């Protein structure tokens, strides 16, 4: 789907459209079924039918927009049929893959570790933003939803633009600059919080701008590091390592709140996770290949 010269744009466009498409659906559901009572087609909140129908429409939306993947996207055929393995043999294969990466491509393994950390920090930004907005800045539920919509729209557009910058400069440069900007924005939210809600609107959205570009650039950067012929395996490890450290941001947030005494201190916990991930990223040496562009 991409060449080395267009990998950033393709990844950024795909990830950015995911943000924008999700917001379009969310807006339809909020305007059509969640906020009004009754909503479209006379659906009411009695028995939570508006929520039920929203879930059904979400499933239909997913199915419809998944169809092009099955019918229009070319796929590189597998070299050979993979044998069916049991649960425990799958774990053995996982550790065998990690051991093989240590010997064959240490930089790929280092990046998997770094990205797992900062991606959990990114998840923490969206997970706890609503909590901080409500408890520390007095946002009501409607304002939190409006902020979330604005954050996703901005991040979607920024992700598409970030892909272009990635092709012009480098994926690692985009990730590093974005992480620096996010940490800066979060610290400013913490420091300037006494000035009022405009601080969260301004610097919270500033941080949200850079979430998508990091996610997109992380994916395309990994594609350039993967040893030829191991694309599916390594992207599987990419997903696995991300889930393996998914406790980091919640733990850091909880610890910071416990130490500081208010939810506002949780921002520093999330910023710390992002900072650690960025430091680990800086230790990864760039040795890209073009294995995914065959």
Language-model features, listed with the residues they occupy:
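Intracellular juxtamembrane helix-capping segments at the cytosolic ends
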Residues: 1-2, 213-226
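Glycine-rich segments within core transmembrane alpha-helices of 12-TM secondary carriers
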Residues: 11-33, 239-249
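A membrane-interface helix-boundary motif in multi-pass transporters
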Residues: 31-60, 255-274
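Multi-pass alpha-helical transporter architecture, strongest
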Residues: 61-72, 268-294
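Juxtamembrane intracellular "pre-TM" segments in multi-pass secondary transporters
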Residues: 74-112
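Short amphipathic helix-loop junctions that connect adjacent transmembrane helices
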Residues: 127-144
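Helix-to-loop junctions at the C-terminal end of transmembrane segments
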Residues: 157-171, 257
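C-terminal ends and interior cores of transmembrane alpha-helices
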Residues: 180-194
């Amino acid at each position: 789907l991409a060449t080395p010269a267009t990998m950033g744009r393709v990844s950024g466009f795909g990830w950015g459209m995911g943000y924008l498409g999700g917001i379009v659906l969310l807006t339809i559901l909020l305007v059509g079924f969640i906020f009004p009572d009754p909503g479209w087609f006379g659906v009411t909140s009695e028995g939570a039918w508006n929520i039920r129908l929203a879930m059904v429409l979400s499933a239909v939306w997913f199915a419809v927009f998944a169809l092009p993947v099955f019918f229009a996207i070319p796929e590189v055929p597998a070299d050979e049929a993979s044998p069916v393995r049991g649960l425990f043999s799958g774990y053995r294969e996982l550790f065998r893959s990690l051991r093989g990466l240590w010997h064959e491509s240490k930089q790929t393994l280092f990046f998997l570790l770094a990205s797992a950390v900062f991606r959990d920090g990114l998840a923490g930004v969206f997970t706890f933003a609503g909590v901080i907005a409500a408890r520390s800045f007095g946002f009501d539920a409607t304002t939190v939803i409006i902020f979330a919509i604005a954050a996703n729209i901005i991040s979607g557009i920024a992700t598409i633009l970030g892909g272009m910058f990635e092709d012009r400069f480098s994926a690692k440069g985009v990730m590093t600059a974005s992480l620096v900007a996010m940490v800066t924005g979060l610290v400013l939210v913490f420091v300037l919080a006494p000035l009022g809600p405009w601080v969260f609107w301004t610097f919270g959205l500033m941080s949200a701008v850079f979430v998508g570009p990091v996610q997109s650039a992380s994916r395309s950067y990994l594609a350039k590091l993967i040893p030829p012929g191991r694309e599916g395996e390594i992207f599987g490890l990419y997903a696995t390592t991300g889930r393996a450290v998914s406790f980091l941001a919640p733990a850091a947030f909880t610890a910071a709140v416990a130490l500081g005494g208010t939810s506002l201190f949780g921002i520093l916990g999330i910023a710390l996770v992002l900072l650690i991930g960025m430091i680990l990223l800086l230790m990864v040496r760039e040795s890209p290949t073009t294995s995914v562009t065959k």
